[in-house]
């Protein structure tokens, strides 16, 4: 690996950008571009490799405490770049051949402001510092974006039903987690991802969250390939297929992809324990899902 120190610590916005820059410098065939910006103006970066005419998407870190997945996906992307350059075969998958037919796009961090708040506190988002401090005096368990909206409750898929579930739990305004906003797509981060998906029309997508070692592949009447994608990831990782709790049903990225775009999609909950999962656990978890990440490229 080319930046060992990066993988041993919580990847804040600065470290993420250093890592992305190092990857793009080492592998000149990698394209790096922002799909949009956060409320505080931080870039929501994407990296791509291969044939963008037939792309798949791996998107991570919708929540501030879930930066663990940024480590996982950048490690994977770096390994895939190396295999592509050196024409390696991994788990019987010819990476060069597959990526010439199908491009891979990864978004290491959908919610850069949320990660900064969780790692560095409210002062990392000066424009919203007063609001954040009003919401909580402890940002160690911050999941939302800078104005207290949970991005994975903000997509237009069963949003009204999800609002009822939020209200039942006493969540009626900006919060560290699980407040879906005043309307669907009210947040610049969710709109950026929505517009990007409408433009790219991905063959399938995987949204990475933590924790639980579970896979969610259903929403209402999902495409058959969503179910098959979930089964494939489960087969090669050992993660179990499950259903999310009521408070996490609807409003999510995977739900919107399935319900509106009719795009096969799954949610993968990585790791075990309590968020934020420690960076020291990432390598063990990576080895557990590495085969599934590779095999799904050839799905």
Name what the model sees in each region.
Residues 1-19, 26-32, 88, 161-299:
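C-terminal accessory segments enriched in acidic
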Residues 31-36, 40:
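N-terminal carbohydrate-binding/catalytic regions of secreted carbohydrate-active enzymes
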Residues 34, 45, 57-59, 105-108, ...:
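Structural recognition of the beta-strand scaffold that forms the well-ordered cores
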Residues 40-48:
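A short loop-to-beta-strand scaffold at the N-terminal edge of the catalytic core in hydrolase folds
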Residues 44, 68-72, 228, 280:
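Generic recognition of short, well-ordered alpha-helical segments
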Residues 50-56:
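Proline/glycine-enriched tight loop/beta-turn segments at coil->beta junctions
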Residues 53, 67-68, 75, 81-218, ...:
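Active-site/substrate-binding loop(s) of hydrolase catalytic cores
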């Amino acid at each position: 690996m080319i930046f060992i120190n990066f993988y041993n610590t919580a990847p804040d916005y600065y470290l993420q950008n250093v890592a992305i820059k190092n990857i793009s410098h080492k592998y000149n065939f990698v394209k790096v571009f922002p799909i949009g910006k956060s409320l505080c103006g931080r870039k929501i970066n994407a990296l791509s490799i291969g044939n963008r005419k037939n792309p798949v998407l791996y998107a991570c870190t919708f929540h501030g405490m879930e930066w663990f997945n940024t480590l996982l996906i950048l490690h994977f992307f770096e390994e895939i770049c190396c295999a592509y350059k050196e024409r390696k075969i991994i788990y019987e998958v010819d990476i060069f051949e597959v990526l010439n037919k199908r491009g891979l796009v990864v978004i290491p961090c959908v919610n850069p402001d949320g990660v900064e708040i969780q790692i560095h506190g409210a002062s990392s988002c000066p424009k919203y510092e007063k609001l954040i401090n009003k919401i909580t005096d402890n940002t160690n368990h911050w999941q939302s974006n800078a104005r207290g909206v949970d991005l994975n409750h903000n997509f237009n898929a069963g949003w009204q039903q999800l609002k009822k579930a939020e209200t039942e739990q006493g969540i009626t305004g900006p919060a560290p987690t699980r407040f879906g906003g005043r309307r669907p797509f009210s947040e610049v981060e969710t709109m950026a991802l929505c517009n990007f998906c409408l433009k790219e029309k991905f063959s399938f997508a995987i949204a990475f969250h933590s924790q639980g070692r579970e896979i969610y592949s259903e929403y209402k009447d999902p495409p058959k390939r969503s179910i098959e994608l979930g089964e494939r990831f489960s087969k090669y990782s050992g993660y179990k297929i499950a259903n999310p709790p009521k408070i996490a049903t609807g409003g999510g990225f995977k739900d919107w992809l399935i319900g509106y775009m009719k795009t096969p999609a799954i949610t993968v909950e990585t790791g075990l324990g309590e968020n934020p999962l420690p960076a020291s656990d990432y390598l063990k978890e990576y080895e557990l899902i590495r085969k599934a990440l590779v095999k799904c490229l050839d799905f």
